[in-house]
């Protein structure tokens, strides 16, 4: 009997859990008995991944914040190295979480295990010299965006552009009315979606300026509805506390675990920079982006940055399509006028551009990723 394909895999946060889920499904479509073990969230676990640690262990935001968790992170890494050394997989996949996964990948690669990093770190945006560490740590990088492969090719680092899983998952035209019915929102009301981040550290810094921005919007648009996407119960409770402290008179409808549906149901979106900005672009909703981290983390990031933009719609376009306000500018004095502009202008040209970009990165990424990894480990891929 042939030994089953065995894949080590580590995802560090919610977006990585979703990528891992699709990757596992695509591999299992060709190798139903394939085994997956490492660190995953609920979606990966539901697909049969054995998670040795809680994924929350790795969900740490910012350079400064990581320092406080460093002893625990080092212990988790050591345990994973020990496990994979004793039980070598056919390949190891690190999904995002580069500060953790690249170190783990380097150790595993040095021990003779083939390694893949899924989701390119933003070497094209800041700390470009990281590409040499990536080269030393990996046998292959799987990149979502076309300009990332161009960057890797320049340095002769193995990389495949696989398209973006979100571009595959989200339809070219999203159904606003169906989403409102699904969420129980009034069909004929104007809705603003508020997404203050998926991590505790993000919500702690971003929720208040977002709520204060909504206060100002409410003064001019008293019939505007505000719907908040909370990724889990912890983030829901955290947002509620900040809401009651900041603007208890304002009404928010908080909906858990359905960020995509919340954005689809909305007319416009106020969101924290990250994967959700790309998702919002693919849903074709006009947006304003705000983001804030610890001041020292922000200062370091600014010094090391080599790109003009933070949000992916702007990076993809190579110009400002959506307004973004980072650090001190993530404040209602900036966010409100930008949001007011979105609410009052004709956004049809923006939506057309979003549609073009959607088509550009739609390539069946789950299958592309699985096939790239299977090629790496010399398995015959199905057509």
UniProtKB/Swiss-Prot annotation:
One of its GO terms (cellular component) is membrane. GO terms for biological process: lipid A biosynthetic process. It is an enzyme of class 2 (transferase). It catalyses: a lipid X + a UDP-2-N,3-O-bis[(3R)-3-hydroxyacyl]-alpha-D-glucosamine = a lipid A disaccharide + UDP + H(+). GO terms for molecular function: lipid-A-disaccharide synthase activity; phospholipid binding. Its EC number is 2.4.1.182. Pathway: Bacterial outer membrane biogenesis; LPS lipid A biosynthesis. InterPro entries: Glyco_trans_19 (IPR003835). The keyword Cell inner membrane does not apply. Belongs to the LpxB family. Condensation of UDP-2,3-diacylglucosamine and 2,3-diacylglucosamine-1-phosphate to form lipid A disaccharide, a precursor of lipid A, a phosphorylated glycolipid that anchors the lipopolysaccharide to the outer membrane of the cell. NCBIfam families: lpxB. This is Lipid-A-disaccharide synthase.
């Amino acid at each position: 009997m042939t030994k089953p394909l065995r894949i080590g895999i580590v995802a560090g946060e919610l977006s990585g859990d979703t990528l891992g889920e699709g990757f596992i499904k695509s591999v299992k479509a060709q190798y139903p008995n394939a085994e997956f073990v490492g660190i995953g969230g609920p979606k990966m676990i539901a697909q049969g991944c054995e998670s040795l640690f809680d994924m929350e262990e790795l969900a740490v935001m910012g350079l400064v914040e990581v320092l406080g968790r460093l002893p625990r992170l080092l212990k988790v890494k050591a345990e994973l190295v020990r496990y994979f050394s004793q039980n070598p997989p056919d390949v190891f996949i690190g999904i995002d979480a580069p500060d953790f996964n690249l170190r783990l990948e380097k150790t595993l690669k040095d021990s003779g295990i083939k390694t893949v990093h899924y989701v390119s770190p933003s070497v094209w945006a800041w700390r470009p010299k990281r590409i040499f560490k990536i080269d030393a740590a990996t046998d292959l990088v799987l990149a979502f965006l076309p300009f990332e492969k161009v960057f890797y090719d320049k340095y002769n680092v193995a990389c495949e552009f696989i398209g973006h899983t979100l571009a595959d998952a989200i339809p070219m035209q999203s159904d606003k009315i169906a989403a409102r019915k699904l969420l129980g929102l009034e069909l004929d009301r104007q809705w603003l979606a508020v997404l203050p981040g998926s991590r505790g550290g993000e919500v702690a810094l971003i929720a208040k300026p977002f709520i204060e921005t909504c206060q100002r919007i409410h003064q001019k648009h008293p019939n505007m509805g505000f719907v908040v996407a909370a990724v889990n119960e912890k983030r829901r409770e955290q947002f509620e506390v900040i809401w009651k402290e900041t603007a208890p008179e304002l009404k928010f409808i908080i909906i858990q675990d359905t960020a995509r549906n919340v954005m689809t149901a909305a007319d416009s979106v106020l969101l924290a920079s990250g994967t959700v900005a790309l998702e919002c672009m693919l849903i074709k909703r006009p947006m304003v982006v705000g983001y804030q981290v610890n001041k020292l983390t922000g200062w370091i990031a600014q010094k090391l940055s080599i790109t003009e933009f933070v949000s992916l719609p702007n990076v993809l376009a190579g110009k400002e399509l959506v307004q973004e306000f980072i650090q001190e500018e993530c404040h209602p004095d900036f966010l409100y006028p930008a949001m007011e502009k979105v609410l009052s202008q004709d956004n049809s040209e923006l939506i057309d551009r979003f549609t073009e970009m959607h088509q550009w990165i739609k390539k069946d990424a789950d299958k592309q990723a699985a096939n790239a990894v299977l090629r790496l480990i010399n398995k015959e891929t199905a057509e």
